[in-house]
Amino acid sequence: MVKVIFFDLDDTLVDTSKLAEIARKNAIENMIRHGLPVDFETAYSELIELIKEYGSNFPYHFDYLLRRLDLPYNPKWISAGVIAYHNTKFAYLREVPGARKVLIRLKELGYELGIITDGNPVKQWEKILRLELDDFFEHVIISDFEGVKKPHPKIFKKALKAFNVKPEEALMVGDRLYSDIYGAKRVGMKTVWFRYGKHSERELEYRKYADYEIDNLESLLEVLARESSSNKKVHPPRQQI
């Protein structure tokens, strides 16, 4: 019987794929507007390569961008990028469609809720607080505090311990097959793959670890209804909802 439901944050509860792309493009446009002597396509493609190399949480993307473009350090250009990025991020920050409605219903049904996410703790909490999602969750587990990222078992085991539940009493919902679904299944949790965002067609070799597949968060309620009505001792085969 499922007692606790864990959610990933990015592209599971918060629509970050579209947000990040818009923010990065606006940053480059604002840098050019303030004197960056490079065309948009060149600067943007270099920025994307930097993000691939250093990760999205690297704090010096725009500083390194100038180096890659063989340009001198210019705090005005860097500030223009930072300002446009953050202004866009705050303006476009949105929940995934249906997220709040589903969270409200899950609390009404008596489920305990948690978040298991990778990323910079300050940035992740900023998203949660700006969207006023914090009251839904008893615990928020962020990998940077643990020294490991999903799918490492440590972060999932810590989440289970926080709620004092067995793995079979927990269900993980996430958009990433490798980090969310494989990671949770490896410690014995039930899993729901949410096909959303830029990762919906990636890492398909890990699809077999999903007990259920959904295309919208409202379908999670149907998954839970099936789970609660099932008397089987084994997990049902993967089902598309």
Swiss-Prot record:
EC number(s) stated in the UniProt entry for this protein: 3.1.3.-
Needed co-factor(s): Mg(2+)
Show the stretches that span the lipid bilayer: none
Question: What GO MF annotations does this protein's record show?
Answer: metal ion binding; phosphatase activity
Record-level GO BP terms: small molecule biosynthetic process
Fetch the InterPro entries from UniProt: HAD-like_hydrolase, HAD-like_sf, HAD-SF_hydro_IA, HAD-SF_hydro_IA_CTE7, HAD-SF_hydro_IIIA, HAD_sf
- Write down the Gene3D superfamilies for this protein, in alphabetical order: 1.10.150.520, HAD superfamily/HAD-like
Keyword annotations from UniProtKB, A to Z = Hydrolase, Magnesium, Metal-binding
Record-linked NCBIfam families? CTE7 (TIGR02253), HAD-SF-IA-v1 (TIGR01549), HAD-SF-IA-v3 (TIGR01509), HAD-SF-IIIA (TIGR01662)
Q: Which family does it belong to?
A: Belongs to the HAD-like hydrolase superfamily.
Explain the purpose of this protein: Catalyzes the dephosphorylation of D,L-glyceraldehyde 3-phosphate in vitro.
User: This chain belongs to which protein, by name?
Assistant: Glyceraldehyde 3-phosphate phosphatase
Q: Which organism is it from?
A: Pyrococcus horikoshii (strain ATCC 700860 / DSM 12428 / JCM 9974 / NBRC 100139 / OT-3)
Q: What is the lineage of its organism?
A: Archaea, Methanobacteriati, Methanobacteriota, Thermococci, Thermococcales
